[in-house]
Curated annotation (Swiss-Prot):
Binding site for ATP: G112, T113, H114, G115, K116, T117, T118
Protein name: UDP-N-acetylmuramate--L-alanine ligase
Function: Cell wall formation.
InterPro entries hit by this protein: Mur-like_cat_sf, Mur_ligase_C, Mur_ligase_C_dom_sf, Mur_ligase_cen, Mur_ligase_N, MurCDEF_pg_biosynth, UDP-N-AcMur_Ala_ligase_MurC
Record bears the keyword Transport: no
Broad enzyme group: ligase
Length: 483
């Protein structure tokens, strides 16, 4: 392919799914160009690696490209897409380009409604510790690597498989993980949950006869499709029939300690005593998927244990910003950021926070993501948002969707008040959220910012705002403004 296609252009190169593929292609020696609406740390990193980054979208950006890569977020009337079509330049969906990368190595694809990014990161970390040096493409920044993608020298590529647009059906890996199946992105499946489950069944059919489907049998919907999976299966979870099973799990100082019982290939492996450097039972399940794959690939047990104990996490997945001084300067609160945006994953993250920080007030700053999701999961959002001790609620991050009546931030605020679960503070403009957090936070609080939209910038803004306030206080104490 390389002797034909040398110049590859990405429309929306700064996106999490796009940037990782672009980085791997750069490392493979392709010339990569890309456009995005604004500059970011991601686009700046790609530029330092050799990519040509252009601001905004214009027809001339595709000049010289042999292929144009787009994600489902890119509209068909984008000027670069129209120009590529007019010039007969192939327009390649992101998932198809990922599938091409997977053809170069043996693919490990992580699917599921929740937990894909963390599980992919755990798998990549364990395989790397085991000396397999995998290539990985992740939807979040792997902190230990400082990037969301890397080209390894080993035989495997580990990547997320996206069910949101059914594009995971383009992939043909040798190992698949299904973490769970939940009602999300239902527009793709005609609001028919049976069609969503059927898509996951079809995903397992992409495996070769020697492939393995690694399935979390704690999830009732995954268990339901189990009889229809015709390829070899490894079951994992807390369930008694799991072949890779966690027992005696407990939270200790923000980590999870548990024992893993493994019954694979007809014989018992030695039990593993694991300390996972992540909180929450859901992350124990994610780690079990990584342990199952590592065991199948004969990664030494000591490497598995070491990788999980030293795992440094993923950007925006229970990412800790440390202790931040309160506005009055008389105490501190713990600041955490998380990507959770579906009620199920939000509940798991909040439960993890309760386990990691027992007896502390939990303050949630939440920005709903997409009007359609807010509409479809409205009652579940009310239920999970009502479990925190204090709530700062932002307006919905539209992600390109038009507003939907009674499915916005104000509607959620009213519903929570009617339910008498909590008295939320509605923060209409996300730019005002950092100050709202500082106004609400008390000494000893745990404050979590949560959502898949622009709220990801808020924790850094909180830290910067408080640093400015402290500097101003120092200036005042010294008797005037600094010269």
């Amino acid at each position: 392919m390389k002797h034909i296609v040398k110049n590859i252009h990405f429309v929306g190169i700064g996106g999490a799914g796009m940037s990782g593929i672009a980085e791997v292609l750069l490392n493979l020696g392709y010339r990569v160009t890309g456009s995005d609406l604004g500059s970011s740390a991601t686009t700046q990193r790609l530029a330092t690696l050799g990519a040509t980054i252009m601001q905004g979208h214009a027809p001339e950006h595709v000049i010289g490209a042999n292929a144009v890569v787009v994600s489902t977020a890119v509209r068909g009337d984008n000027p670069e897409v129209l120009a590529a079509r007019a010039k007969r330049i192939p327009i390649v969906p992101r998932a198809v380009m990922l599938a091409e990368l997977m053809r170069l190595k043996q693919g490990i694809a992580i699917a599921g409604t929740h937990g894909k990014t963390t599980t992919t990161s755990l798998v990549a970390s364990v395989l790397a510790e085991g000396g397999l040096d995998p290539t990985f493409v992740i939807g979040g920044r792997l902190n230990s690597a400082g990037a969301n993608a890397r080209l390894g020298t080993g035989d495997f590529i580990v990547a997320e498989a996206d069910e949101s647009d059914a594009s995971f059906l383009n992939l043909f890996p040798v190992i698949e993980v299904i973490t769970n199946i939940d009602a999300d992105h239902m527009d793709t499946y005609g609001h028919d949950f049976a069609r969503l489950k059927q898509a996951f069944i079809e995903f397992t059919q992409r495996l070769p006869f020697y492939g393995i489907a690694v399935l979390c049998v704690d999830d009732p919907n995954v268990r339901e499709i189990l009889p229809f999976v015709s390829k070899p299966v490894v079951r994992y979870g807390f369930a008694e029939d799991a072949q890779v099973r966690a027992v005696n799990a407990r939270a200790v100082d923000g980590r999870m300690e548990f024992t893993v019982i493994r019954q694979l290939n007809g014989h018992a492996e030695p039990p593993l005593s694991i300390t996972l450097n992540l909180p929450g039972l859901h992350n124990v399940q994610n780690a079990l998927a990584a342990i199952a794959i590592a065991t199948e690939l004969e990664v030494p047990d000591e490497a598995i244990v070491k990788a999980l104990a030293e795992f440094n996490g993923v950007g925006r997945r229970f990412q800790r910003y440390g202790e931040v001084p309160t506005a009055d300067g008389k105490g501190h609160f713990t600041l955490i950021d998380d990507y959770g945006h579906h009620p199920v994953e939000m509940a798991a993250t909040l439960a993890a926070a309760r386990g990691a920080f027992p007896d502390r007030r939990l303050v949630l700053s939440f920005q709903p993501h997409r009007f359609t999701r807010t509409r479809d999961c409205f009652e579940d959002f009310v239920k999970v948002l009502g479990t925190v001790d204090a709530l700062l609620l932002a307006e919905v991050y539209a992600a390109g969707e038009p507003p939907i009546i009674a499915a916005d931030g104000r509607a959620l605020t009213r519903a929570l008040r009617v339910a008498n679960k909590i008295e939320p503070v509605f923060v209409e403009q996300i730019e005002d959220m950092p100050q709202a957090i500082l106004d609400a936070a008390q000494d000893g609080d745990v404050v979590i910012t949560m959502g898949a939209g622009s709220i990801g910038q808020v924790p850094g803004q909180v830290v910067a705002l408080q640093a400015q306030a402290r500097t101003a206080n120092v200036v005042d104490l010294n008797g005037g403004a600094a010269a």
